[in-house]
Design a protein with these regions (language model features):
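Membrane-interface helix/loop caps of multi-pass membrane proteins
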Residues: 1-168
């Protein structure tokens, strides 16, 4: 959870710094994220593939392949949420299970700069209230949902990112 708070803080800080210096560009923002995240993700995947091939049974290998695709396209949080753990391999045989949080984070990185710039430019003096409202909405949403959705879907995690944004 603190990981998402930290990300909200860092990303909003980077965006504001770039705006204040007159050098924010979406392209540069996303290229920096790609250079920071993809090498570690692809290293993990490259190291996992041979072990998965050697150690997993056909059903587990199929699940691994699906989780690999979902990890590369940053929707592993949705993939693992919809996975039937009762009929699937053990979590111990899912080497990319930890990428659920990367999926949430990347979804935030894709959406947040656009929303942030809209609110920051139009409502600069009131943007903190808007981000606080998003934080409250996410907390209320958590209170109304008693399923695993709270763990895997970004709307239930937004309060953590927004807390980081508001700390900034």
């Amino acid at each position: 959870d603190i990981f998402f708070v930290r990300s909200g803080y860092l990303i909003s800080n980077i965006i504001i710094s770039d705006i204040n210096n007159g050098k924010f560009k979406f392209r540069h923002f996303y290229l920096r994220r790609i250079r920071r995240i993809l090498p570690a993700l692809f290293s993990t995947i490259i190291l996992s593939v041979p072990f998965a091939y050697i150690l997993l049974q056909p059903k587990g290998l199929l699940e691994f392949s699906r989780s690999l695709i979902s990890s590369v396209f940053f929707y592993s949080n949705l993939y693992f949420r919809n996975l039937d753990f009762y009929n699937s391999s053990s979590a111990k045989t899912m080497p990319l299970l930890h990428t659920w949080s990367l999926g949430i984070e990347e979804q935030f990185y894709i959406i947040f700069p656009i929303i942030f710039l809209i609110f920051f430019k139009k409502f600069r003096n009131n943007s903190a209230f808007i981000f606080f409202a998003i934080l409250l909405f996410s907390i209320l949403l958590n209170g109304t949902n008693q399923t695993d959705d709270k763990f895997y879907y970004i709307q239930f995690r937004l309060w953590e990112f927004m807390l980081g944004v508001l700390i900034m």
